[in-house]
Amino acid sequence: MGHVDVARVSLALPDGRLLLDEVSLRVGEAQKTALIGPNGAGKTTLLRIIIGDLAPDSGTVTGSGGLGVMRQFVGSVRDDSTVRDLLVSVAPPRLRAAAAELDAAELAMMDRDDRPTQLRYANALAEWSDAGGWDAEVLWDTCTVAAIGVGFDKARWREVRTLSGGEQKRLVIEALLRGPDEVLLLDEPDNYLDVPAKRWLEQALIDSPKTVLYVSHDRELLARTAKGIVTLELGAAGNTTWVHGGGFASYAQAREDRNSRLEERLRRWDEERVKLRALVLRLREKSAYNDGMAGAYQAACTRLERFERDGPPRAVPRRQSVTMRLRGGRTAKRAVICESLELTGLMKPFDLEVWFGERIGVLGSNGSGKSHFLRLLAAGGSDPDPEHRPVAGTPIGAVRHSGQARLGARVRPGWFAQTHEHPELIGRTLLDILWKGDRHRDGMGREQAARVLDRYELAVAGEQQFETLSGGQQARLQILLLELSGATLLLLDEPTDNLDIASADALQAGLEAFEGTVVAVTHDRWFARSFDRFVIFAADGSVVESDVASWDEGRVERAR
């Protein structure tokens, strides 16, 4: 089995700010370790250093056993890549190289059929075989059946963007767990997964003999699988790590105890410095008229200089403080009305009424149509009019349906996109986005914009472009824009997926104070506890209402 060892790694950002300050951690053989911390603290950056994508300014990374990697973007792939491309991308390096050469040789054969081209193709096939390509395809067949319900031959050329986010995640995780690499780095493996798939992931990690370092904010996953927890903590001069050798059940108390010890050490250090400075002052006064005290004075000065040169003990990490002020406004009593609504090719016709002020959770398996339902409402329903125009400039694709979905009077939908798709924000900094505003919200002065960003712990990222933010920072910005937009109906598609624990708590507090209606798709079992009732997209294609959450719905059976 393999291991990962990170020793005193530091990295500065291009603007000179220190992001990681002598970060250290070790993941031993077969250990399951979680990497947690605030959004934007550098978790994904640290994984990229371990992978080798980034070179640290100082420190070392060593390991053994081969490295399998699932990057954070898996689940939100929207390009023209195929299922085969995705599986090849997480294969070992030799297999990736063999696949690239085989693809190039096949393209060359289409242009010309001369002897050198034929020889190149034959050599590429031989290398594909020697690299384990045929064996990999047998393994991938098992993975595609488990993840999307069809064999590899049928799924091979299917575009990844036609899969739900959860199906993309499940496919890659299946391939990595069954693959040859002994060390796995998983960036947000639970994002986009429905609850049955999360339960599968939990058991798969427990059963796997592989060494796993994963980033997650899902407390259920942490509690069930993590045997060690590495926390990236915010620091004034760069973020540092604290390693907890136990599980999540003991984590909160252990961290509180450790922070109390740090506070006590710092208090004692401050007291000692005050005493030493007072001693130096007394001896200086005495030595001014007593030559015999000169030696004692110099000794005290040396002692104080050495004490201050060694510096204070490690400071208590800065605590996150996210404050969301979602306001809303009064609307008609019936906020959403669905009559014989059928999402074409997804779910059977259903009726639904959502009343002003309700908190509705939308549950069901991946691919069942939940996100399509939210997009239909976000676009204003079946026959949108100006009163129901969305409060954001994000393009919303048409949703094929029959029947009717209507919004009540004064209902303004605000949509939180699961994949953070905001082409209108690409290339723009956060301060620029808030300063200029758009047709849905007024702009604001730079000082006011900075204060608003600070409430969301985004002030430090104010000059960053939207696409360079971490997933959690993008999620917080989406919620901030909803706060400023005047939405009275919040349509939230997996809003807690990328949020760290403190931000998820802040979102729940913000929703409790929101004077409006909330409809949220979620697979977050903790987040769902705050909802009034649930709309369940069932495995048989029906849509049913329930007062209790149901997490056991299987995949909707349809042609794939």
Identify the residue ranges that each predicted region occupies.
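An exposure/low-complexity boundary signal
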Residues: A300-E305, L482-E483
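A short, surface-exposed helix-loop junction/capping segment
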Residues: T117-E127, R277-S287, R319
